């Protein structure tokens, strides 16, 4: 009963699709027509919704490649009719060069007029194992509802329908018809269809009767009997099953009366051929619910007019920059439109990341690429290193990020606070870009410590806070004139440095001077580096002015290595040579330094 219903349905659809009035059955819910809407892909509120192209006869007007056509050369064929038990034959000439007597493949897909049938016809008696094939290219992927053939000759005894999803490169069976399924196609007869095999072709003996001798119909419904047809939206298996780019019909064996081997077999054999008046493939352009029509592109190829931010011939991918969630087919419940990446107008490209999508609760997985306008981050939502947010402009503004402009000497790095723009300043440096010394600090010539504390100088020297010992003259002899430095003195000392006295502090039996070492001319085994260090001198040496030094002055200091109280400073005593700095010392000290490298100190 069900097969009869489907056969009648397919026949009605074949006629109705020519005038655009096809109605689907219960198993064809995916092909249900839509009422005319201003925008089929959006609802009355402008929200996306599933839309599908019109149902059409995809074969209409298309070329069909056939393996056999009568009339080349002209040949006789006979039409069999029955009057009671008597068979009558009316013979004619098939001649491809005469339009009135030709039966070309174009008649398969022309307008089917029941009152003026046009029939394609094969050569006579191409019997098994020879077959005749009809191959139809649909031009793009379609979701096929049915394939129907109306015959001018008796229907074949065995016939197969195939489909291709890759434009004819490979073929898979769609349906088999035969009274001997196992012998002809190695298939069981009317095998039950379950969810496990609903994507497989079955073989049936329906539609294989020889009668009627003309006008018989074979109609194959792609979803008839498939268990998941009622839930097509959620069945990728059936969505794939109904998809085709090409359809092929293979006629495998003719029906005969068994008289082809009798004495008048030539006349009988001229009565056996395949003739079809109409080939129809009912279905819709496959657009996955994201287009309401198919159009011709610049290459004259048939493609979907994609909506919902989708792209591709079948709207089977998201269009560029709309990768915030994965592509999905539209359903009756959800349009599943593609969503643009959120890049705050600072990027033109993005990619999809499944891990981020899952972590977001399946809401957002887009990652922006090549953020512009000095922005960075997954959404180009913060400023890149070396820039900070201008809070007076929205993040979408081209100039939302301003350069830090951190001072190359005063700042400890090139990055700044993303909110305030404050650069990280070195000790004693202040300002949003670290471009000036803080209160209580003064500028130095050192790029390492550009600002140093202003020392609080004692009234005269450090020795003023301590009475001069009575035996000072016997302890050391303070210099009372200009000191001279020569190569011999240079070589006798362990270190030679240019220092700037910053401040002095009493520390028990010692005076601790904070000095800035400007240049190192000799260091021996001492680990003396440029920058701020401690200079330790015993209180007795200071009291006896051996050596005599004053804060805020610059000196050339030559001394011997000795352990200091803090293990990181240098020590000077009465034997040290302390000379007030003059710029000429720099040239002389470098000269001594070069001679030392040449081994002159050993000779001295």
Curated annotation (Swiss-Prot):
Protein's GO biological process: animal organ morphogenesis; anterior/posterior axon guidance; apoptotic process; axon guidance; axonogenesis; Cdc42 protein signal transduction; cell population proliferation; cell-cell adhesion
All copies of domain Laminin EGF-like, residue ranges: 285-340, 341-403, 404-453
Signal peptide: 1-24
Pfam families: EGF_laminin, EGF_LMN_ATRN, Laminin_N, NTR
Domain Laminin N-terminal as annotated: residue spans: 47-284
The protein's assembly and partners: Binds to its receptors; DCC, UNC5A, UNC5B, UNC5C and probably UNC5D. Binds to its receptor; DSCAM. Interacts with APP.
Disulfide topology: 119-152, 285-294, 287-304, 306-315, 318-338, 341-350, 343-368, 371-380, 383-401, 404-416, 406-423, 425-434, 437-451, 472-544, 491-601
Top-level lineage group: Eukaryota
Protein name as annotated: Netrin-1
InterPro entries tied to this protein: Galactose-bd-like_sf, Laminin/Netrin_ECM, Laminin_N, LE_dom, LMN_ATRN_NET-like_EGF, Netrin_domain, Netrin_module_non-TIMP, TIMP-like_OB-fold
Compartments, record wording: Secreted; Cytoplasm
Role played: Netrins control guidance of CNS commissural axons and peripheral motor axons. Its association with either DCC or some UNC5 receptors will lead to axon attraction or repulsion, respectively. Binding to UNC5C might cause dissociation of UNC5C from polymerized TUBB3 in microtubules and thereby lead to increased microtubule dynamics and axon repulsion. Involved in dorsal root ganglion axon projection towards the spinal cord. It also serves as a survival factor via its association with its receptors which prevent the initiation of apoptosis.
GO cellular component: basement membrane; cytoplasm; extracellular region; glutamatergic synapse; synapse
Intervals of motif Cell attachment site: 530-532
Segments forming domain NTR: 472-601
Glycan attachment residues as annotated in the record: 95, 116, 131, 417
Keywords recorded for this protein, A-Z: Apoptosis, Cytoplasm, Disulfide bond, Glycoprotein, Laminin EGF-like domain, Repeat, Secreted, Signal
Keyword Cytoplasm: yes
């Amino acid at each position: 009963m069900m097969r009869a219903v489907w056969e009648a349905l397919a026949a009605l659809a074949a006629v109705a699709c020519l005038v655009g009035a096809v109605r689907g059955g219960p198993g064809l819910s995916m092909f249900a027509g839509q009422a005319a809407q201003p925008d089929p892909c959006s609802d009355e509120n402008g929200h996306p919704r599933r839309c599908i192209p019109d149902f059409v006869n995809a074969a209409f007007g298309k070329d069909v490649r056939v393996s056999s056509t009568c009339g080349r050369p002209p040949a006789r064929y006979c039409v069999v009719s029955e009057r009671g038990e008597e068979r009558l034959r009316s013979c004619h000439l098939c001649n491809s060069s005469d339009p009135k007597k030709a039966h070309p493949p174009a008649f398969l897909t022309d307008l089917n007029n029941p009152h003026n049938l046009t029939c394609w016809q094969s050569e006579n008696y191409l019997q098994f194992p020879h077959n005749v094939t009809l191959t139809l290219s649909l031009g793009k992927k379609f979701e096929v509802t049915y394939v129907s053939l109306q015959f001018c000759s008796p229907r074949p005894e065995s016939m197969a329908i195939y489909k291709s999803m890759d434009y004819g490169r490979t073929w898979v069976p769609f349906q088999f018809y035969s009274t001997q399924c196992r012998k002809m196609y190695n298939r069981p007869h009317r095998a039950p269809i379950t969810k496990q095999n609903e994507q497989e072709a079955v073989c049936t003996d329906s539609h294989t009767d020889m009668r009627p001798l003309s006008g018989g119909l074979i109609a194959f419904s792609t979803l008839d009997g498939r268990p998941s047809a009622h839930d097509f939206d959620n069945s990728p298996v059936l969505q794939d099953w109904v998809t085709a780019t090409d359809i092929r019909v293979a006629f495998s064996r003719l029906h005969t009366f068994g008289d082809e081997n009798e004495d008048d077999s030539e006349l009988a054999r001229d009565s056996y051929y395949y003739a079809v008046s109409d080939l129809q493939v009912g279905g819709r352009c496959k657009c996955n619910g994201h287009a309401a029509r198919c159009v011709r592109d610049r290459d004259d190829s048939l493609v979907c007019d994609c909506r919902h931010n989708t792209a591709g011939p079948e709207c089977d991918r998201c269009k560029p920059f709309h990768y915030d969630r994965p592509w999905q087919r539209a359903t009756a419940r959800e349009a599943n439109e593609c969503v643009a990446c959120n890049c705050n107008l600072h990027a033109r490209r993005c990619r999809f990341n499944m891990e981020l999508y899952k972590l977001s609760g399946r809401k957002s997985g887009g990652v922006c690429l090549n953020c512009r306008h000095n922005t960075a981050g997954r959404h180009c939502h913060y400023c890149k290193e070396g820039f900070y947010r201008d809070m007076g402009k929205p993040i979408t503004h081209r100039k939302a990020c301003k350069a830090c402009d951190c001072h190359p000497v005063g700042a400890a790095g090139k990055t700044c606070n993303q909110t305030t723009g404050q650069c990280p300043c070195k000790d004693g440096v202040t300002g949003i870009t670290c471009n000036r010394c803080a209160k209580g600090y003064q500028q130095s010539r050192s790029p390492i410590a550009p600002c140093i504390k202003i020392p609080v100088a004692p009234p005269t020297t450090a020795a003023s806070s301590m009475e001069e010992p009575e035996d000072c003259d016997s302890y050391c002899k303070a210099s009372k004139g200009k000191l001279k430095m020569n190569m011999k003195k240079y070589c006798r000392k362990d270190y030679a440095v240019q220092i700037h006295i910053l401040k002095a502090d009493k520390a028990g039996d010692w005076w601790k001077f904070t000095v800035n070492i400007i240049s190192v001319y000799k260091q021996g085994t001492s680990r003396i580096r440029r920058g701020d260090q401690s200079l330790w001198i015993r209180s007795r040496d200071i009291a006896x002015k051996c050596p005599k030094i004053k804060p805020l002055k610059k000196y050339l200091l030559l001394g011997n290595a000795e352990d200091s109280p803090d293990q990181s400073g240098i020590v000077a005593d009465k034997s040290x040579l302390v000379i007030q700095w003059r710029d000429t010392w720099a040239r002389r000290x470098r000269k001594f330094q070069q001679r030392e490298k040449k081994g002159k100190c050993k000779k001295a």
